Amino acid sequence: MPAVRILILAACCCWLLLLPVRCCGPGRGPVGGRRRYMRRLVPLLYKQFVPNVPEKTLGASGKSEGKIRRGSERFIKLVPNYNPDIIFKDEENTGADRLMTERCKDRVNALAISVMNMWPGLKLRVTEGWDEDGHHAHDSLHYEGRALDITTSDRDRNKYGMLARLAVEAGFDWVYYESKAHIHVSVNTDNSLGVRSGGCFPGTAMVMMETGKKKPLSELKLGDTVFTTDETGLLIHSVVLLFLHRDPYKTATFVLIEAEGHPTKLLVTPNHLLFIKSSSSTGFQPTFAYRVQIGDLIQIYVNGTQVQSSKVVRVSVDEQTGVYAPMTEHGTLLVDGVLTSCYATVESHTLAHASLAPLRLFQGIASMLPDLHTSDGVHWYCHILYVLAKYVLWWDMP
């Protein structure tokens, strides 16, 4: 039997390698490979920051861990960036501006490609990177190699709003149109759980059962039938197949979303997918929760047989213990009365749903692997998908 299991898993892994390629075609390589979807890029406004939370919260770049001093144990974890497509100002002539964390290096290299694609002939310019001279506030992320100040090589300030938007798309954890002279960007720590975690809801979040009663996610079980919607917005039943992530003891930061005329607040982790209609989109699109802005539309259930649109009136952050990510057979569900995707990390509901097809089609495989589908933590299958996407297919994952 162990040999049979290994063969089955190997066959599934081979299929998984083909799924994303078949759906999206070839990528651009290890850097800048984030899949782009058909939506208009809207420049940031002066003094706007994304996500709409303070920089040093867990929903953005996280807390400061203290200054990194040259020669210290933490200093050796900073890596130099010699990307020829980036101009480093380096006014100190020490090479300090080239030093940054691995995550920061990945993001800025991705941004450099986007800049050249957006404005042929121009390059990204870094005016400030790691700071060892004490020129910033005492808890600045510049002291940790996690923050950069950037411009375009032509220093055209009319481009800075779009440069900030490109930085958001490149995966920086916090982007701020801070000054007329530059854009400020920063990232979370390389070892942060917030960087590697997917998307979930708190255990107190409620789903509506087929009986009409509500049940908290902490009590939801495999095989339960909950409400979701079809393509037209009509309510339908959907069976809970498994938990993509379940950890009752993990503390996480959630995006808190309040909608007009909806009594319940939705709490969801930043990289979870919601169906959002913004001013720049023609319909409801799968969107990371951290991108939600006041004025965007979400789909809520109040009563009757279908969902309705409601305007987002407040976005904030909250920290709670317990994370749950159930997956239904339809890939969607109503959580606290809001229509949500079951998926996270990849900003394509269709692709995520297709990639998890083997779990829906071959439940017998999971039954041959005792406890793997019921244990706490990230589901083993999702972990395989993440590793394949990030390290084999070279996808740019958050």
From Swiss-Prot:
Keywords of this entry: Autocatalytic cleavage, Calcium, Cell membrane, Developmental protein, Endoplasmic reticulum, Golgi apparatus, Hydrolase, Lipoprotein, Membrane, Metal-binding, Palmitate, Protease, Secreted, Signal, Transferase, Zinc
Annotated site location: Essential for auto-cleavage: 272
Signal peptide coordinates: 1-23
Keyword Phosphoprotein in record: no
Residues that, per the record, bind Zn(2+): 142, 149, 184
Positions contributing to Ca(2+) 2 binding: 92, 128, 131, 133
Site-annotated residues for Involved in auto-cleavage: 269
UniProt GO BP: cell fate specification; cell-cell signaling; positive regulation of smoothened signaling pathway; protein autoprocessing; regulation of gene expression; self proteolysis; smoothened signaling pathway
Lipid-modified residues, N-palmitoyl cysteine kind: 24
Transmembrane found in the keyword field: no
InterPro entries referenced in this protein's UniProt entry, alphabetically: Hedgehog, Hedgehog_Hint, Hedgehog_sig/DD-Pept_Zn-bd_sf, Hedgehog_Signaling, Hedgehog_signalling_dom, Hint_dom_C, Hint_dom_N, Hint_dom_sf
Enzyme class: hydrolase
Domain of life: Eukaryota
EC number from the UniProt entry: 3.1.-.-
Subunit record text: Interacts with BOC and CDON. Interacts with HHIP.
Database matches in PANTHER family: DESERT HEDGEHOG PROTEIN, HEDGEHOG
Protein name: Desert hedgehog protein B
Gene name of this polypeptide: dhh-b
